[in-house]
């Protein structure tokens, strides 16, 4: 299978990063699976979150938690950024952007719940970690035939 591994972005945001580097071995395997049109939405979401975590690690982030649940909802990924800021990362994976950009699915209501869940995560005794700040990021993945677009928006809200 020939695959276009150029990762591009179609959204603009101050501080946003887009991957244009060729993927490393583990990410390359996930690229093929992300482009598999037979994946069910839940499978696509789980694979997208794994891809996002690996992508962020490749960019210097350290995983602190994954799929952490509170009464306000789930935090997809909690990471320590290279500048020692704790980043709560909401991942949105789609097959198309025909119905809008994936980040548009992070509504004001969702943002409020993510903030509340983030506060709860920080208050957990096991999560007392030296850090310089906190932010909420959105990382979007659009996977369509042969191409995966990754767009990371630090401090999205």
Tell where the protein language model's regions lie, with residue ranges.
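Intrinsically disordered, low-complexity charged/polar segments
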Residues: 1-24
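Catalytic cores of nucleic-acid endonucleases
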Residues: 9, 32-33, 93-144
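Acidic-basic catalytic patches of nuclease active cores, encompassing PD-(D/E)XK
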Residues: 19, 23-66
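Residues at secondary-structure transition points
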Residues: 39, 43, 47, 72, ...
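Conserved catalytic cores of phosphodiester-cleaving nucleases, focusing on short active-site segments
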Residues: 56, 75-79, 83-97, 114
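Short acidic/glycine-enriched loop/turn segments that link adjacent beta-strands
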Residues: 71-74, 146
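Protein kinase-like catalytic core scaffold
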Residues: 73, 85-87, 135-137, 151
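Short, low-complexity, polybasic intrinsically disordered segments
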Residues: 140-157
